[in-house]
UniProtKB/Swiss-Prot annotation:
The keyword Phosphoprotein appears for this protein: yes
Positions where Phosphoserine occurs in the chain: 607, 751
Keyword Lipoprotein among UniProt keywords: no
Highest rank taxon of the organism: Eukaryota
Name recorded for this polypeptide: Myotubularin-related protein 10
Domain spans labelled Myotubularin phosphatase: 221-661
Biological processes, Gene Ontology terms: phosphatidylinositol dephosphorylation
Annotated GO CC locations: cytoplasm; cytosol; membrane
Family stated for the protein in its record: Belongs to the protein-tyrosine phosphatase family. Non-receptor class myotubularin subfamily.
Pfam families registered for this protein in UniProt: 3-PAP, Myotub-related
Species of the source: Homo sapiens
Gene coding for it: MTMR10
Ranges annotated as biased composition (Gly residues): 197-214
Region feature (Disordered): 196-217
């Protein structure tokens, strides 16, 4: 219904194989025995030898020869040839350099050059011609191309059909995670790649934090105690943990334990639950220190009982507030774009970044980006979340997020509000616990929204939009976040790996039900366990080495306990507004709800400045005036890193997340450029500060603590004594704007040097028109 089919690939000359030159004559396919590295439960279903992976479109001299393999987990290209032009590779322990998980594949296109035929392959389809070329379009914007010039035609056809079949399963239990976990239970083996696997539940298992050696586990909110600790952490004295949904007896799309107002009895909740869509009772999210609470709730479908139940719920929330403040209700369905609109915007964004040749889009790049509406929607979610922060923080009102089912838009808004209000959720462990609480356990439909089973009518990238909005905050307040944008990008990539239970199911109940059925069919004894225990995405040691995980750390971050010394005295850290700003121009004089007013919008037609939507009907002029005053006062003061942060949401401040959307486009790389250069220098400084701090602690401490300090591992990837940095005055040659990802080996297009897009990637102001860019020196 609301999804758009992936855009059909454009087969222009830049996609066709180049004229054969002496390069091909001189490059003989290597005849060697190449074997894949398989995970437990992974099996090879088809393979073909003498395959050529295309590295560039204008020459074949960089192409690699090897074997193309399709397993029940990934497609893998195995070669002995070194990757040309590549200076650095960020290795995932689960995937090889040329591997693509099956759940990351969006579209498979086969081509026959001689017959000038092409076909988009679906599951269980027949292929009437022998393919000479295979093009794989990935969900993360990668395009990978293989040639079968020297391969057996039947073998090439079979491997193409196998990839199409296994990348588009129709049943949840056909996803690789089930085979992996089943093998683990049968073999009683708790290791993967030699690293112990997580023992957590289907929500993903607690896992350690991103840093090497971190012992802080991510709470999964699968138990009573996790919710109770969160109540105590936030000081929500008027709320209690309720267990009426144990065994999912009330709702199959809520967690077994929920937090409700203390004044509501279990019996009342059971009666009320029948009136809500999906029986999704009000679900507590978070409480402010002033007593105001953030609550999410589905619509009341019983029209006759709607007023009565709504009044009872609001009264209970009011009683839970120490000041008995009123409740502010936000109807997200009326305020924000729906999931269909978000999906349509993402499809347009992907088509702009991937499918169209740059020569055809260069003159209309800025207006085309604006027309996707992706940045507009990111801005809309940030703006509305900031307005709710005002209600909670300044007005001391409890906020109820109301949505038809309460498991899509409310996930994103509730998470953004908490990131803005609570510095704990800006740490790595806190951010992971937030995703567990507001997405995984609250019933966000990862299976459908990520389209793991190729049901495109239910697909919508709301989780990516949340990560994008979080990146906007990180970009504006870099010192307020413990994690880096690399962490956010890798987190998004992990949703496309069908090994982790975290991003595999529509609800905790579905995980328990499906895994129990699978265990019975495979004669697996579960004992007292509630379903199979899937690997945890939060156990990052499954995917990356301790050294690589240090790239998750943000060198800008100033922890709450970190002091700074001024004039010989220790003071808490506070940044001025000027030093905080990473924006392209100052804040305009007329600020309205965090955006510039109509009279200050630039009139340029191709501008990316996004015009404000009309304010919600429920807001009065007085509320608008109060909100405007709150934002104006907040932005006039120095920002407190350990308090509230608010986004600047004018068009000049909402940017395209280049690392996420352009990292696989070779032409978009800026060698020795991009934000990574600043990241590199600041990492060196942060590492030096850490070393000096350890030395000071060793001087002041006893032998035991001094010994511990000496063993402390650097939290920075780049450090003065590390293997990746020998000259502190220079920049490593492998750095580029795509770091730590390498786009080499993905489908290349013609050069874009000198075009508006290349200037945009180099940091040109996005509100300038094509004509202005053309006139720049």
């Amino acid at each position: 219904m609301f999804s758009l089919k992936p855009p059909k690939p454009t087969f222009r000359s830049y996609l066709l194989p180049p004229p054969q030159t002496d390069d091909k004559i001189n490059s003989e396919p290597k005849i060697k025995k190449l074997e894949p590295v398989l995970l437990p439960g992974e099996i090879v279903v088809n393979e073909v030898n003498f395959v050529r992976k295309c590295i560039a479109t204008d020459t074949s001299q960089y192409d690699l020869w090897g074997k193309l393999i399709c397993s029940n987990f990934k497609i893998s290209f195995i070669t002995d040839d070194p990757m040309p032009l590549q200076k650095f590779h960020y290795r995932n322990l689960l995937l090889g350099e040329h591997d693509v998980p099956l759940t990351c594949i969006e579209q498979i296109v086969t081509v026959n050059d001689h017959k000038r035929k092409q076909k988009v392959l679906g599951p269980n389809q027949k292929l009437k011609f022998n393919p000479t070329e295979l093009i794989i379009y990935c969900k993360d914007f990668r395009i990978v191309r293989f040639r079968f010039d020297e391969s057996g035609p039947e073998s090439a056809k079979k491997v193409c059909l196998a990839i199409a079949h296994y990348s588009q399963p129709t049943d949840l239990q056909l996803l690789f995670a089930f085979e992996y976990v089943g093998k683990k239970y049968h073999n009683s083996a708790n290791k993967i790649n030699g690293i112990p696997s997580g023992d957590g539940g289907g929500g993903g298992g607690g896992g350690n934090g991103a840093g090497g050696g971190s012992s802080q586990k991510t709470p999964l909110f699968e138990t009573y105690s996790d919710w109770d600790r969160e109540i105590k952490r936030t000081g929500a004295s008027g709320w209690r943990v309720c267990s009426i949904n144990e065994g999912y007896m009330i709702s199959t799309c809520l967690p077994e334990y929920i937090v409700v107002p203390s004044s509501l009895a279990d019996q009342d909740l059971k009666i009320f639950s029948h009136s809500f869509v999906g029986r999704r009772m009000p679900l507590w999210c978070w409480s402010h220190s002033n007593g105001s609470a953030l609550v999410r709730m589905a619509l009341i479908k019983d029209v006759l009982q709607q007023r009565k139940i709504d009044q009872r719920i609001c009264n209970a929330i009011t009683k839970s507030h120490p000041q008995r403040s009123d409740v502010y209700k936000s109807d997200l369905d009326k305020t924000l774009p729906n999931i269909q609109e978000v999906q349509a915007a993402f499809v347009k964004l992907k088509q702009l970044c991937v499918n169209e040749p740059f020569e055809e889009t260069e003159e209309k790049w800025l207006s085309s980006l604006e027309n996707t509406r992706w940045l507009e929607y990111v801005r809309a979610f940030l703006k509305h979340s900031a307005e709710l922060v005002y209600m909670l923080e300044s007005k001391h009102l409890s906020v109820v997020l109301q949505e038809e089912e309460g498991r899509d838009l409310s996930c994103c808004v509730a998470s953004l509000v908490q990131v803005m209000l609570d510095p704990y959720f800006r740490t790595i462990t806190g951010f992971q616990s937030l995703i567990q609480k507001e997405w995984v356990m609250a019933g966000y439909q990862f299976l459908d929204r990520c389209n793991h089973l190729k049901r495109s009518e239910k697909e919508s990238p709301l989780f990516l939009l949340f990560l994008d909005a979080t990146w906007q905050l990180l970009e504006q307040y870099p010192a307020a976040f413990e994690f880096s944008e690399t962490y956010l990008a890798v987190l998004y990539d992990s949703t496309r790996i069908s090994l982790f239970g975290t991003f595999l199911f529509n609800s905790p109940h579905q995980r328990v039900k499906q895994s129990t059925e699978f265990a019975i069919s495979k004669n697996i004894q579960l004992g007292d366990e509630k379903g199979l225990k899937f690997p945890s995405v939060w156990d990052w040691s499954l995917q990356f080495t301790a050294k690589d995980r240090t790239l998750f750390h943000n060198p800008f971050y100033i922890g709450k306990s970190t002091p700074c010394i001024q004039n010989g005295s220790v003071k808490s850290f506070k940044r001025t507004k000027k030093s905080y700003s990473s924006t392209l121009r100052g804040m305009p004089s007329a600020l309205k709800n965090g955006i510039i007013s109509d009279q200050e919008l630039l009139p340029r037609r191709n501008s990316l400045i996004l015009k404000p939507k009309p304010d919600p009907a429920q807001q009065t002029d007085s509320q608008n005036s109060d909100t405007e005053q709150y934002f104006r006062e907040w932005f006039s003061k120095p920002a407190n890193l350990h308090g509230v942060i608010l986004p600047r949401v004018s068009g000049t401040h909402i940017k395209l997340w280049k690392l996420c959307y352009f990292r696989w486009v070779p032409e978009a790389q800026i060698s020795l450029g991009g934000s990574i250069t600043a990241f590199h220098k600041l990492s060196l400084l942060a590492d030096e500060v850490d070393v000096l701090s350890r030395m000071l602690r060793q001087q002041r401490s006893g032998p035991l603590e001094a010994c511990y300090g000496e063993l402390g591992q650097s939290r920075m990837y780049f450090n003065a004594s590390g293997p990746h940095h020998t000259d502190t005055s220079g920049t490593p040659e492998f750095l580029s704007s795509s770091f730590p990802f390498s786009p080499v080996g993905n489908l290349c297009r013609r050069s874009i040097l000198g075009t508006p897009l290349s200037k945009f990637l180099s940091g040109a102001k996005i509100w300038l028109s094509t004509e202005t860019l053309a006139n720049e020196d």
